[in-house]
């Protein structure tokens, strides 16, 4: 039996976002809200959207086909394909089965995996399943692909500017330049009605906004603690009881991560959450020199009150202001310029990070990732960037592609939302959106027949 695969992780990555977006400052004016409510209050600059020509099938096909093409991946070399999404078109048929159109013509139908659904967390579950598959006795030597993506839409009102659209596809296998740290995961899963989609006649969710923010913050706390506990166990095993840890007195546990990526419902929430991680470090060790200026009354603050306490928020956002700019902000380009891609958001954050920072394989960097899906399921895990990622950066061509989009007025965005409302659940339907607006290589819907079967073409 050959040795087990080593350095399992991400070998290739592709991001897709629609060709059209709306400017959040213009949206503020259009919605009649105060200046800065979306751009400063939420930390959002632009928001991606699509008309009735794109759906989850087309977006997944576009992203997966682009990954295969750009990285010259042989479709026969894939043994697992899994999709994470919460944008459902069918209560039975998976998005993964639709993607088999990219593999079956090459004679490859022996591919494991289906769809994983839990709000914005499905992509991470698909990644975990794929990593587990490569590390398992079921692995047949081939690579896995994970596709995660969504169209995030909200009914008119306070939540609408937190929408977005896009997808990420990743090639996962051994000997990767971005390696998942084995065994280092902490999760928090519980029952909560913070954001859910019980009305299948609508694309819009039911949202309890304030409660959802609290759930997200609780999940950050719990996952960070669970990750630290797991790390402690693994370190103890490696050291076999000896104390081989060198402690730098000036550093906090948060400093063990060179970069941190978050699921980003809004970029402002990410900034608060990074500060929240340091608050957890403070509670674990209030006498650490880094916390000399922290008001002592915060040490004994009731946990429930900590979610709404402005002193906690301001203190730890202040203490992390510099490190946030260095370690978190580089991963937020797609989130601030496209909005929330739901399942794809944290992985689009990885694409942003790769595109903004030059990584040297001789100096591996450690990146923490926090993934959250309402309802709720969440995890914190970490990767090490150990290899050459310059080829990924070149193929992503992220900034050039972001700048190539068309910014449309809020009125048009509103009309597109209405267009999608009319298209929802229709059969015998021909979309009316203009395919000429799409980027070349984009799959788009041409018709839905009388049995709800969908047909697509590719923009030349």
From Swiss-Prot:
Source taxon at top rank: Eukaryota
Pathway given in the UniProt record: Metabolic intermediate biosynthesis; (R)-mevalonate biosynthesis; (R)-mevalonate from acetyl-CoA: step 2/3
Q: Which reaction does it catalyse?
A: acetoacetyl-CoA + acetyl-CoA + H2O = (3S)-3-hydroxy-3-methylglutaryl-CoA + CoA + H(+)
- Molecular function in Gene Ontology: hydroxymethylglutaryl-CoA synthase activity
State whether keyword Magnesium applies: no
Q: Name one Pfam family in it.
A: HMG_CoA_synt_N
Active site residues per record: 86 (proton donor/acceptor), 120 (acyl-thioester intermediate), 263 (proton donor/acceptor)
Name of protein: Hydroxymethylglutaryl-CoA synthase erg13B
């Amino acid at each position: 039996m050959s040795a087990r695969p080593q350095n399992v992780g991400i070998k290739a990555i592709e991001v897709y976002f629609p060709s059209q977006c709306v400017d959040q400052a213009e949206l503020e004016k259009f919605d009649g809200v105060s200046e800065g409510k979306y751009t400063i209050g939420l930390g959002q600059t632009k928001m991606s959207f699509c008309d009735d020509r794109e759906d989850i099938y087309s977006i997944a096909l576009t992203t997966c086909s682009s990954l295969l093409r750009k990285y010259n991946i042989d479709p026969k070399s894939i043994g697992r394909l899994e999709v994470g999404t919460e944008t459902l078109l069918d209560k039975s048929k998976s998005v993964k089965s639709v993607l088999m159109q990219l593999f079956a013509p090459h004679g490859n139908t022996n591919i494991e995996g289906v769809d994983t659904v839990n709000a914005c967390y499905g992509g991470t579950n698909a990644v975990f399943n794929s990593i587990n598959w490569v590390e398992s006795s079921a692995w047949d030597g081939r690579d896995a692909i994970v596709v995660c993506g969504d169209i995030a839409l909200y009914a008119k009102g306070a939540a609408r500017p937190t929408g977005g659209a896009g997808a990420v596809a990743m090639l996962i296998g051994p000997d990767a330049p971005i390696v998942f740290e084995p065994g280092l995961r902490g999760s928090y899963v519980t029952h909560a009605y913070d954001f859910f989609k019980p009305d299948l006649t609508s694309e819009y969710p039911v949202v309890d906004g304030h409660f959802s923010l609290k759930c997200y913050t609780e999940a950050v706390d719990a996952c960070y603690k669970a990750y630290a506990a797991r790390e402690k166990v693994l370190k103890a095993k490696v050291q076999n009881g000896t104390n081989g840890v060198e402690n730098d007195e000036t550093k906090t546990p948060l400093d063990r991560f060179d970069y941190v990526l978050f699921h980003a419902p809004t970029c402002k929430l990410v900034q608060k959450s990074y500060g929240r991680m340091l608050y957890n470090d403070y509670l674990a060790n209030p006498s650490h020199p880094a916390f000399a200026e922290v008001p002592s009354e915060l040490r004994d603050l009731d946990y429930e009150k900590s979610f709404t306490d402005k002193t906690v928020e301001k203190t730890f956002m202040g203490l992390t202001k510099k490190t946030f700019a260095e370690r978190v902000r580089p991963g937020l380009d797609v989130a601030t310029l496209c909005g929330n891609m739901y399942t794809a958001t944290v992985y689009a954050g990885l694409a942003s990070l790769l595109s903004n920072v030059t990584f040297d394989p001789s100096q591996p960097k450690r990146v923490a990732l926090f993934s959250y899906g309402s309802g709720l399921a969440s995890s914190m895990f970490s990767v090490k960037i150990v290899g050459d990622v310059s080829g990924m950066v070149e193929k992503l061509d992220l900034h050039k592609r972001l700048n190539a989009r068309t910014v449309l007025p809020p009125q048009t965005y509103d009309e597109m939302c209405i267009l999608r409302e009319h298209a929802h659940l229709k059969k015998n339907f021909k979309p009316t959106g203009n395919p000429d607006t799409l980027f070349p290589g984009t799959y788009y819907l041409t018709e839905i027949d009388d049995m709800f079967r969908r047909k697509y073409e590719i923009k030349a």
